[in-house]
Structure formats: structure tokens, C-alpha cells
């Protein structure tokens, strides 16, 4: 009846949701790959490798030109990594926007639009540090009037450390953004799953209650049937007694004999 129809409908919704859940896991897998690529550019390991190679080049340099080129290379690669990261961020954002819309249409999940993110702040910081370096460190005057080791030390203490801080901030911001991008979908999927489970359990309880009610009704009908039979028997006895009482005394004596 109605309960069976409701159960069938919820089971169908559950099957559709489970199919959507598989697509969600596929999205998570692609999202994870894209995240790894992002941190391949913006990650601190890449910056650490760049810093180490730059230090070796500057320490082993015999000409001021080599020192100058090493500093320029350091900023160039740092900027390239931020630019590549921006490209990965744009791809992640485009994919998540499409996924949000798809899940909204297919499952009625209200996701809105994914939060945007940019590394513009870090890019400006890198540009500012390079300008400072070009004005106060990477100049012919500085190269001629200061010992090479002093120039190298100053570059890593006053410039490279600030670049690292900028990348550390970029990593923290990126991690927070990635969590924020996935959170609405994860929340909606989890809530939808809970709602379906509750509906199915509720309908199961109704179904069980209906079966119990039917059993109780059948039991009452059986009791009623027994009572009707008993009442009919009593009525027959009463009728017989009444007939007996209505007969003349002689006839009653004869019957009694």
C-alpha cells in the first residue's frame, strides 16, 4: 500500500544518492591530485631546494655578476612558482564551480558558489622584496664596497627569510581555502545521507507498526468471533429456558421426567 510505495521511493532516492556519492569520491580524488600539484609549486620543500641551490651558487661565486644573477634567479623562480600556483588555483576553482552546480541540479544540494582565492598578496610581497634588494643589496656599489660573504649573509637574513614567511603564509591560506571549498559539499552530502537514513528508518518503523496493527486487528477479530459464538450459544440456551418456562406445569413435569 502507501507504506510500500514510500519505502520504494526512498530506496530509489538512496540508490541515486549512492551513485552521486561515487561521483563525489571521484571529485575528491581529482581534487587531491590538483592540490598536490598546487603544493608542488607553492610548497616549502620547493622553496627550500631553491634557497639551498641559491646559497651554494652565491657562496661559490667568484664574480659579482654571478652573485647578482643568483639573486635575480631566486626571485624569478619564486615568482614563477606563485604564478603556477595561481594557475592551479584557477583550475581547482573552475572544477569546484562545475561540481557545485552539478550536485545542485542532480541532488538539490544548496551549495552556492565556491569561495575564491588569490596569491596576489604574496606576489606583491615578492615584488617589494626584490625592489628592496635591487636598491640596497644587488647593486654594483654594494658588490664593490662589501665582502661577498657579507652580501650573501645579508641576502639570506634580510631577504630570503621574508620570502619564506610569504610562502608560509601562502601555504596556510591555501590550506584554509581548500578546506573551505570542500566543506559545503561535504556538509551537504553528509546531511543528505543522514536525512535519507532517517526517512528510511521512519518508514520501516511505520511498516512494522502497520504489521503489528494488522496482527492486533486479526487477533481482535478472532476474539470477536469467539465472543459472537459464545453469545449465540448463550442466546440459544436462554431461548430454550424461556420456552421451558412458558410451557404449562404438566408439560414441564413430563419434559423433566
Task: Describe the function of each predicted region.
Residues 1-252:
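Extended helical scaffolds that flank P-loop GTPase cores
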Residues 254-257:
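Eukaryotic, compositionally biased intrinsically disordered regions
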Amino acid at each position: 500500500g502507501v507504506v510500500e510505495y514510500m519505502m520504494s521511493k526512498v530506496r530509489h532516492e538512496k540508490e541515486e544518492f549512492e551513485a552521486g556519492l561515487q561521483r563525489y569520491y571521484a571529485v575528491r580524488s581529482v581534487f587531491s591530485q590538483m592540490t598536490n600539484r598546487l603544493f608542488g609549486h607553492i610548497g616549502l620543500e620547493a622553496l627550500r631546494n631553491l634557497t639551498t641551490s641559491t646559497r651554494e651558487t652565491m657562496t661559490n661565486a667568484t664574480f659579482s655578476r654571478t652573485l647578482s644573477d643568483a639573486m635575480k634567479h631566486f626571485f624569478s623562480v619564486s615568482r614563477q612558482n606563485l604564478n603556477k600556483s595561481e594557475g592551479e588555483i584557477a583550475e581547482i576553482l573552475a572544477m569546484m564551480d562545475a561540481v557545485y552546480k552539478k550536485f545542485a541540479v542532480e541532488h538539490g544540494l544548496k551549495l552556492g558558489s565556491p569561495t575564491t582565492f588569490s596569491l596576489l598578496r604574496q606576489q606583491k610581497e615578492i615584488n617589494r622584496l626584490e625592489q628592496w634588494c635591487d636598491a640596497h643589496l644587488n647593486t654594483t656599489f654594494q658588490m664593490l664596497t662589501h665582502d661577498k660573504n657579507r652580501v650573501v649573509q645579508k641576502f639570506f637574513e634580510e631577504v630570503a627569510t621574508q620570502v619564506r614567511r610569504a610562502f608560509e603564509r601562502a601555504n596556510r591560506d591555501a590550506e584554509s581555502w581548500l578546506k573551505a571549498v570542500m566543506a559545503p559539499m561535504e556538509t551537504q552530502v553528509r546531511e543528505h545521507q543522514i536525512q535519507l537514513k532517517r526517512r528510511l528508518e521512519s518508514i520501516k518503523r511505520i511498516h512494522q507498526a502497520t504489521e503489528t496493527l494488522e496482527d492486533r486487528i486479526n487477533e481482535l477479530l478472532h476474539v470477536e468471533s469467539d465472543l459472537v459464538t459464545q453469545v449465540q450459544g448463550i442466546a440459544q440456551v436462554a431461548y430454550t429456558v424461556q420456552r421451558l418456562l412458558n410451557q404449562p406445569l404438566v408439560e414441564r413435569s413430563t419434559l423433566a421426567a
